[in-house]
Amino acid sequence: MIQSKRQQGASFEYQARLFLERQGLTFIAANQRFNCGELDLIMQDQQTIVFVEVRQRKNQIFGSAIDSVDWKKQQKWLDAANLWLAQYDSSLEDADCRFDLVAFGATTNDIQWIPNFLDE
């Protein structure tokens, strides 16, 4: 059965969630949409809110999953996180948060987790 891109994305996001939960993170929310962008996963690592971007690439013709998170995507990620935090009377300036990337290759077994991706 052929999956749509949305179904494939949801599948990889779910696999990323399970992976992060095995690493000790707690699930908060998924697919939080704002005008500026979407937050794939929101997790918690002890007291830290973790905004997770999930990326997948079947091949590297146009670059890796990691390479696909360009400056424009990073800005949308930051803006969406700030809007999510604002719902709780918080902001990036005062919240204990970080931005992690979970990147998949062709399969869910080919996974790379990069904590603090935006600090790299």
Curated annotation (Swiss-Prot):
Belongs to the UPF0102 family. NCBIfam families: PRK12497.1-3, YraN family protein. GO terms for molecular function: nucleic acid binding. Gene3D superfamilies: 3.40.1350.10. It comes from the Bacteria. This is UPF0102 protein HSM_1206. Pfam families: UPF0102. InterPro entries: Restrct_endonuc-II-like, tRNA_endonuc-like_dom_sf, UPF0102_YraN-like.
